[in-house]
Amino acid sequence: MSEQRIIRPTPISGFPEWTPRIRSVELRWLDHIRRGFERYGFSSVETPSVEVLDVLLSKGETSQEIYTLQRLQADADDSSDARLGLHFDLTVPFARYVAQHFNDLVFPFKRYQIQRVWRGERPQEGRFREFTQCDIDVINVDRIPLHFDAELPRIVHEVLTGLDIPAWTLNINNRKVLQGFYEGLGITDPLAVIRAVDKLHKIGADAVREILIDQAGLSSDQAAACLELAEIRGSDTTVVDAVAKLGVSHPTLTAGLDELGEVLDELSDLPSGSVVADLSIARGLDYYTGTVYEATFNDDPGYGSICAGGRYENLAGQFIRRSLPGVGISIGLTRIFAKLVSEGRITGGRFCPTDVLVVLPSDERRSAALAVAAQLRERGFNTEVYHQAAKIGKQIQYAVKKDIPFVWFPPFDDGRPHEVKNLATGEQVEADPASWNG
């Protein structure tokens, strides 16, 4: 008989997984984020992991980053799954969802969505092929008030401040500022410039200047003006004055500066430096039309954005004949969490949910031990019974290794009292499973 082939398990690059101890911290983070979103009245939504490819490609995402779905043993003429792909973000699926369920929703519709997404990127530090995003969006019929553009950064500030993460800054810009400035310079394809400027922090000013001149067709003076705009940064409305000094005028530019100033005013009560207007922030996706956000770690801005989003005027327009503008922002949970794990800032917490371990002195006592466990569970204590009869010391060691705080000793002889031991203090006392309070 031939030996069974052993498949050596190896990690898959770009697909992170955690030990139970680390995962317990991630779950607490997820619960904290969920509660933060719900405090502001956002409702939970979940969409399928897959969408029709036409939906995923409807807003300009590159097809190279989309994982398609097909059965391994699919027939050559079976195309039923050929047009399905894993979603690369949660915004486009959300737009499809709103259009599909339009008559069942109350507007403005405030939703949060915490799910995994997939992108066919080259794995590297801070970039994964499977990761968790935590999104909030507000979408409305015909018009969405600008104050929502300020509410979302406020929510993110509260949520991230409640997590033990390194200092970070949320940078804000407005696509109308960029588009109006570029059009005021006589640039005919502002989107091409926006995509180039979006790479500024990754490839540097010289490389962006080269793209602007060689690929976007700008003159040297136009490219210089675009880069000069991108250097403007400030935590208050003085950025508006700085743009005015560049001497470019356009109605769209004026509208964008007005919106940017209003959002900054509404966020002026947040701690100094936590929200900054940064006119280099562009966000390369085509569907953003107004306010855009991008947050980075202060001590490692090159790590990439940990939170991003923006305003869109008609994201659902290809799915329904209604105007449905919205604004959204997404927290990159996996990117933040993985950095802290790799740096040793997260070493894990109490990973086992068990509150009480009921020892099993003998197989004959299993029924009695199970009855004790049932009583404790009814009273709200997560309880497990040791899996087999064994020496008491071995069972206690099991509890210690799993961070179980209490060990319960049923009567070894009929008529004797129950006892419970607190492993943190070493105290062991008599207790009644029907009334014990922990």
Swiss-Prot record:
It is an enzyme of class 6 (ligase). It holds the Pfam family tRNA-synt_His. GO terms for molecular function: ATP binding; histidine-tRNA ligase activity. Keywords: Aminoacyl-tRNA synthetase, ATP-binding, Cytoplasm, Ligase, Nucleotide-binding, Protein biosynthesis. GO terms for biological process: histidyl-tRNA aminoacylation. Its EC number is 6.1.1.21. SUPFAM superfamilies: Class II aaRS ABD-related, Class II aaRS and biotin synthetases. The keyword Nucleotide-binding applies. It catalyses: tRNA(His) + L-histidine + ATP = L-histidyl-tRNA(His) + AMP + diphosphate + H(+). Its main location: cytoplasm. The keyword Cytoplasm applies. One of its GO terms (cellular component) is cytoplasm. InterPro entries: aa-tRNA-synth_II, aa-tRNA-synth_II/BPL/LPL, Anticodon-bd, Anticodon-bd_dom_sf, His-tRNA-ligase, HisRS-like_core, HisRS/HisZ. It comes from the Bacteria. It is found in: Cytoplasm. PANTHER family: HISTIDINE--TRNA LIGASE, HISTIDYL-TRNA SYNTHETASE. Homodimer. Belongs to the class-II aminoacyl-tRNA synthetase family. This is Histidine--tRNA ligase. The gene is hisS.
